[in-house]
């Protein structure tokens, strides 16, 4: 089926932006799997998220940009469990669970992979397939971060942290309030590597208390 000229132009515009992106170019040079690596590096530099020996869950992990950073930071005595609906090439020090995180079976596989360990940091970079229609995309995005928070509540150690990509829009304020009910402190971050036109921000919740 032929695509419309508008779709073709939009795709061409996205590709040009992607290949011109300095973080994309840096990721090739530095050996990182995606430009998203720089978001986590910046957040870690500011908030000291990752330390040797930590147990970390990475949701929405493919192609592995965050897991790559996390595995390096937590070291051999740490543990990184990553999950995504998409395939992800193996990474040393990372246990990967492939599947749809909205399905109970995938959640159970993540819990099994933990082998009884409590988690120090749950990270979610999940996002739905965007249609460009806020009325559809925003509820789907909020549903994913709600599920991520549910997992964090099940697995975090007391005092643990939760980092999630959230899109500003309907449901954002209510979600922020919900986070504040389970954590001592919640801050909003917008990494430099996050595209300026994007509605995405990262909420960092610290001091989990249930």
Swiss-Prot record:
Give the molecular function GO annotations. Answer: rRNA (uridine-2'-O-)-methyltransferase activity
Domain of life per record: Bacteria
Report if keyword Transferase is assigned: yes
Which enzyme class?
A: transferase
Q: Which GO terms describe its cellular component?
A: cytoplasm
Tagged with keyword S-adenosyl-L-methionine: yes
Q: Where located?
A: Cytoplasm
Give its E.C. classification number. 2.1.1.166
> What is this protein's gene name?
rlmE
Which positions bind S-adenosyl-L-methionine?
A: 64, 66, 84, 100, 125
Which residues are annotated as active site? 165 (proton acceptor)
Lineage of the native species?
Answer: Bacteria, Pseudomonadati, Pseudomonadota, Gammaproteobacteria, Oceanospirillales
Q: What does this protein do?
A: Specifically methylates the uridine in position 2552 of 23S rRNA at the 2'-O position of the ribose in the fully assembled 50S ribosomal subunit.
Q: What is this protein called?
A: Ribosomal RNA large subunit methyltransferase E
Which InterPro entries does this one have? RNA_methyltr_RlmE, RNA_MeTrfase_FtsJ_dom, rRNA-MeTfrase_E, SAM-dependent_MTases_sf
Q: Which Pfam family is an annotated match for this chain, by its short name?
A: FtsJ
> Which of UniProt's keywords are assigned here?
Cytoplasm, Methyltransferase, rRNA processing, S-adenosyl-L-methionine, Transferase
Species this chain originates from: Chromohalobacter salexigens (strain ATCC BAA-138 / DSM 3043 / CIP 106854 / NCIMB 13768 / 1H11)
Give me the reactions it catalyses.
Answer: uridine(2552) in 23S rRNA + S-adenosyl-L-methionine = 2'-O-methyluridine(2552) in 23S rRNA + S-adenosyl-L-homocysteine + H(+)
Primary localization class, coarse = cytoplasm
* Family, similarity comment: Belongs to the class I-like SAM-binding methyltransferase superfamily. RNA methyltransferase RlmE family.
């Amino acid at each position: 089926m032929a695509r419309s000229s508008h779709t073709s132009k939009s795709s061409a515009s996205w590709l040009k932006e992607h290949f011109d992106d300095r973080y994309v170019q840096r990721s090739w040079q530095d050996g990182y799997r995606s430009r998203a690596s720089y978001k986590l590096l910046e957040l870690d530099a500011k908030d000291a998220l990752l330390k040797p020996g930590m147990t970390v869950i990475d949701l929405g992990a493919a192609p592995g940009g965050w897991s790559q950073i996390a595995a390096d930071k937590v070291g051999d005595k740490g543990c990184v469990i990553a999950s995504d609906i998409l395939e992800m090439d193996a990474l040393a020090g990372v246990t990967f669970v492939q599947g749809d995180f909205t399905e109970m079976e995938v959640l159970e596989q993540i819990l099994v992979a933990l082998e009884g360990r409590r988690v120090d940091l749950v990270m979610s970079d999940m996002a739905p397939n965007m249609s460009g229609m806020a009325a559809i995309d925003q509820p789907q995005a909020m549903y994913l971060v709600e599920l991520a928070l549910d997992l964090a509540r099940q697995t975090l150690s007391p005092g643990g942290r939760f980092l999630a990509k959230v899109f500003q829009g309907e449901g954002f304020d209510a979600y922020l309030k919900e986070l504040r009910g389970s954590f001592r402190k919640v801050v909003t971050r917008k990494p430099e590597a996050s595209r300026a036109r994007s509605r995405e921000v990262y909420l960092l919740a610290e001091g989990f208390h249930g």
